[in-house]
Amino acid sequence: MPQQWPATDIARLILDGFDDYREHFRRITDGARERFEQARWQDTQTASAARINLYEEKVGETVARLREYFEPDTLMDVTCWPLVKSAYISIIDLRFDDELSETWYNSIFCSLFSHDLISDGCMFIHTTRPSLRRARAAQTRTYKPQGQISGMLASIFADYRFSEAYADLPGDLLRLEAQLRENLPDWVCKDPELSVELFSSVLYRNKGAYLVGRIYTNDDQWPLVIPLLHREGRGIQIDALITDEAEVSIIFSFTRSYFMVDVPVPAEFIGFLKRILPGKHIAELYTSIGFYKHGKSEFYRALINHLANTDDQFIMAPGVRGMVMSVFTLPGFNTVFKIIKDRFSPSKNVDRATVIEKYRLVKSVDRVGRMADTQEFADFRFPLSKFEPACLAELLEVAPSTVSLEGETVLIRHCWTERRMTPLNLYLDNANEAQVREALEDYGLAIKQLAAANIFPGDMLLKNFGVTRHGRVVFYDYDEICFLTEANFRHIPAPRTPEDEMASEPWYSIGPLDVFPEEFPPFLFADAAQRKLFDQLHGELYNADYWKGLQEAIRAGKVIDVFPYRRKGLDNE
């Protein structure tokens, strides 16, 4: 090993790239307040996509600089990279975003070297960061009502102000106080030790701003989220006060776009969120505020820890086998793993590259709470003993170019992970009458909200939707999605002759992007009762004019409101 091998220089250049990424990330994030105040909703969508793409762009730039500054024989000597890791640890020790900088280092290493060279000696498979920082207090503001809830609420909104005035602050405060008293037991509202703690920075996403914190006494606590809207021409409206943990969990769901929020010390804020949402894994919380790569790191660490400490084995996921993807899971780990088959069913008019493109598209669009977020992985290596034999046999049969056996190790060259849900078709098979109605209502609403966000699912079969633990219907099969404005919605032409009407084949031409909503009922529902109920609930989905109207609104630049919470006593404009 050369004595003067430039480990510190390489480490510093990697960290310089991270600093550049963080500066651009902060710049986009800090602009969220102004975009909200000025109601620049299309700019908000553009900024969200730009921030997601930023990470890979900056990784590419950093790798290019490394290749420019160091000779290949030096840079690519993997035996020396433990020295780079050691030097890197020493220069990130005083940072407030050190856990993110470890993930950045891993991304650079994986961009330079093949994944079979990954080891904890060369990169951060396990974090070296102290857990102490997560226990430190986040930057918050605390308010005590001291018997005057109305006065406390007034103090909160005296601190959280915008360049645009509140439209009706007195009326909003009266409504919030009523909601607070409705949501919490009377004894809590009268408790002299009652306190409200809010994170100092406002969270922004889509057309909303959110105050996030908790309400607590000496004995108990409740999460607290207060969403704000900007009603153009009228000002800022305080939209709701939410204290239900399940509802707050949905706001931070894996089906939502990422928040924009100023977090000087990310781990402190994540610790604060974890305190009010103990059921959320930190991987999901990091992802929810835009640090999706670090969320991926924390997910992987949780996965390898689960495999090391349980007897769980991979099995094929329940449900109808996919025509494009093969899906497997761990019973004790709330995730599915999706790989692309080598051969697709004949009815599928897509190829592997198109499928990859579709899944990556989902990362950058507004998922409006109706599409599961994904993480993409390359070169997963798992012990052979962790696979149920029938599962491994099926994977090797349907995707031999992706899954292979190397001694006692199973190599999965490429896969996506998604949150595991109950397939909607299986859910309906076991649901009572009320549950069927609720699920079909939400299924139609999911299709409508996706469409209004300019996403057409393509294949809308029940098996391609899942039901979350909160009972929400979510789309998760992306190989046929497209932008709604790309589809050509048509009415079925009237038959020209009696022979046309009796023909087994269409009497009209069909283009590759043509969609005939009148064909949906028998296509979506084999069960006649479910078909009839869905027609009552969402019959407009069978009319091409409904879809064309949405297309016109989207082309006119309208950005829809999709609320991740229930709204009380407000208009639904």
Swiss-Prot record:
Q: Name one Pfam family in it.
A: AceK_regulatory
- Reactions this protein catalyses: L-seryl-[isocitrate dehydrogenase] + ATP = O-phospho-L-seryl-[isocitrate dehydrogenase] + ADP + H(+)
Annotated GO molecular function terms are: [isocitrate dehydrogenase (NADP+)] kinase activity; AMP binding; ATP binding; phosphoprotein phosphatase activity; protein serine/threonine kinase activity
Q: Which domain of life is it from?
A: Bacteria
> Where does this protein reside within or beyond the cell?
Cytoplasm
Mind telling me which GO cellular component terms the entry cites? cytoplasm
Q: Which residues form a coiled coil?
A: none
Q: Where are the transmembrane segments?
A: none
Active-site residues (renumbered): D373
Q: Which GO terms describe its biological process?
A: glucose metabolic process; glyoxylate cycle; tricarboxylic acid cycle
The protein's Enzyme Commission number: 2.7.11.5, 3.1.3.-
User: Which keywords appear in this protein's UniProt record, sorted alphabetically?
Assistant: ATP-binding, Cytoplasm, Glyoxylate bypass, Hydrolase, Kinase, Nucleotide-binding, Protein phosphatase, Serine/threonine-protein kinase, Transferase, Tricarboxylic acid cycle
Q: What does this protein do?
A: Bifunctional enzyme which can phosphorylate or dephosphorylate isocitrate dehydrogenase (IDH) on a specific serine residue. This is a regulatory mechanism which enables bacteria to bypass the Krebs cycle via the glyoxylate shunt in response to the source of carbon. When bacteria are grown on glucose, IDH is fully active and unphosphorylated, but when grown on acetate or ethanol, the activity of IDH declines drastically concomitant with its phosphorylation.
Q: Which family does it belong to?
A: Belongs to the AceK family.
What is the name attached to this protein's record?
A: Isocitrate dehydrogenase kinase/phosphatase
